[in-house]
Design a protein with these regions (language model features):
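Short gly/ser-rich loop at a beta-strand->alpha-helix junction or flexible surface loop bordering the NTP-binding
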Residues: 1-165, 199, 281-301
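Surface segments flanking catalytic/ligand-binding clefts of nucleic-acid enzymes
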Residues: 14, 142-301
Length: 301
């Protein structure tokens, strides 16, 4: 083997056998991923490379799991610099790798990396994530076509204890057609406050059957929509935020639209709920804030 034939990640032994000197291995053309495992410097996808490198260290039956698997599957999870592996037997201790014992019967392959399936990844992460983050993950995996809401529910059905209960509850709240994590968070804010759950991504057609508009969250029978807007105003974010509230008074083809920005979820969730409840009453949608659980997940500032 010659240096140009080395795989994406390789061991120090493989590099030396291919004619790469120890000095060259420490130079700018290569980078160390884990102890005795290296990659070419130009290889860009950090998660993919680190996952491959971890599998080089792990036993043959190891799978990439949890947060790392979720990211490779296209799911949205809080950042975690560690690579997570599932091992059917044995143990593995290496800096930057978290390995757990788990017997896996099915696997997916993403870019040459063996990972736990989307459903198994979702259930496993019930041990690490909050309810809202778990729903965000489930929505994103379904959106990527890696699973369905029904397959999530089926996978979570056998879980035991508090972790299993959390997985089942989150799976029951996963929806298809969600466009972004913030839409998931906005929907969960409403649901955890005890408000009726709006329909996800309802499409409105005109009298000729032509597509008119799609609403993030809505009560179509009452022509009420709740939209997350993450765009930056051309002049300034402050000006854009000032423009949002007046837009609630502007109905589009008879629709009342409540526009919610990031601050309405992270900084002012209580005010967002008040705005939505007021709009619901004006539109004739029955519902009120019946739970304080939302405060645990959306504390605001």
């Amino acid at each position: 083997m010659t240096p140009d034939r080395l795989p994406t990640v390789f061991t120090r032994t493989e590099a030396l056998a291919a004619g790469v000197s120890a000095g060259e291995l420490r130079g700018p053309r290569y980078r160390k991923v884990f102890h005795n495992v290296h990659a070419r410097s130009e290889v860009a996808h950090e998660t993919h490379v680190r996952a491959l490198a971890a599998l080089v260290i792990g036993p043959d039956a190891a799978l990439v799991a949890r947060q790392t698997a979720a990211e490779l599957l296209g799911g949205v999870v809080p950042p975690d610099v560690r690579v997570h592996l599932a091992l059917p037997t044995g143990r593995l201790r290496a800096r930057g790798i978290r390995a757990v014992r788990r017997r896996v019967t099915h696997a997916a392959v993403i870019g040459g990396v063996r990972v736990t399936t989307a459903e198994d990844t979702f259930v496993d992460l019930a041990a690490d994530l909050s309810l809202v983050d778990l729903v965000v993950l489930g929505d994103s995996l379904v959106s990527k076509g890696r699973a369905t809401s029904h397959s999530m529910v089926a996978a979570a059905a056998e879980g035991a204890g508090p972790v299993g209960e959390l997985a089942r509850r989150a799976a029951g709240l996963v929806r298809a057609g969600v466009d972004s994590p913030m839409e998931s968070r906005l929907r969960m804010l409403l649901v955890l406050a005890g408000l009726p759950e709006p329909l996800v991504n309802h499409i409105e057609y005109d009298d000729w059957g032509r597509w008119v508009r799609r609403y993030d969250l809505s009560f179509p029978e009452r022509r009420l929509a709740i939209e997350y807007d993450g765009r930056q105003h051309a002049e300034s974010q402050r000006q854009w935020e000032r423009d949002v509230d007046p837009r609630e008074e502007l109905d589009l083809d008879g629709w009342r639209i409540v526009v919610v920005l990031a601050k309405g979820i992270y900084r002012e969730p209580g005010r967002t709920l008040d705005r939505v409840v007021a709009a619901m009453r004006a539109a004739g949608v029955r519902g009120s804030i019946r739970s304080t659980e939302w405060r645990l997940h959306f504390p605001g500032q």
